[in-house]
Amino acid sequence: AGLPTEEKPPLL
């Protein structure tokens, strides 16, 4: 699950 996080890097 890759949620668009602003503070944390996106999990691709």
Curated annotation (Swiss-Prot):
The protein's location, in the record's own words, is: Plastid, Chloroplast thylakoid
Identify one Gene Ontology CC term for this UniProt entry. Answer: chloroplast thylakoid
Predominant subcellular localization, coarse grouping? plastid
Keyword field: Chloroplast, Plastid, Thylakoid
Lineage top rank: taxon: Eukaryota
Q: What else is known?
A: On the 2D-gel the determined pI of this protein is: 6.0, its MW is: 21.3 kDa.
Q: What is this protein called?
A: Unknown protein from spot 110 of 2D-PAGE of thylakoid
